[in-house]
Amino acid sequence: SSAASDVYKRQIDDERFAHAYAHDKLTYDKWGRRKIEQGLYQKGVSKDIYGKVLDEISDERYIEVLKPLLSKKWKTIKGRNDYECAMKLMKYALGRGFELSVIRKCIDDMEIPTDD
């Protein structure tokens, strides 16, 4: 087998791995694009492969994962007021690798109970 076909085979393997990794981390571990990107980088997957894989994650699917995660976390967050709780929620989601713009959109869409 030639060196060129070995390189091609490795790229196909890396692509398949990157797809499976991204799918599993988003679905089961509730990771955002940034954290998935970091993981793929650490595993030695090339930027053009993981860039393409991350671009294929639809925003709908992404929000579908993030909203329930934020709703569940909201119930356990303690803070002096809703603003402080929302900031903690944002920090939590950023730590899981989600982007600020998506987090903000999800928080804005959430029915956040106020302490009346």
Where are these regions (language model features)?
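An alpha-helical, amphipathic repeat domain used for nucleic-acid recognition
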Residues: 5, 9-116
